[in-house]
């Protein structure tokens, strides 16, 4: 579990650095916010790595997924960045971090639980930062939900902004998301963007002699 989250935190650091490189002309206050968030994500990565080491696990002992990088790195604008990273994958972590902090605490691993709890509270601010800039850059006639939904492109869809655990309305409200956005996301169902594997079975086929 910690290895999985460390993988995602490191990818977030790299994507934030990429955003700073890709968008040098973005507003200074936006770039400063990204840099501040990047530093917090570096802390998160360090916390996970240290805790993993204490548990006898090294980074790379398990599979490392490039999925978040492959989905977000093609971003073409700062609005793409906040829509996909801040308001999608970081929003999903409002569910995951809270859920697993509670699970770890119940299981007796208070040290790991505290790490997840601290990260959860940081993620609230990260989602809020993305929401602030979505509201600044979107068409003012659009709702937050419509503007965000329109900005997402396959394979990223709104379902990615929800964890596969309990839906955390409280954390989303603390991040500033409005009730229309929260209820729309709660109801939303779609593919998570993975292409299905198709298999063809030919009952008449025989092994070659």
Q: What is each of the regions a protein language model found here?
A:
Residues 1-209:
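Non-heme di-metal
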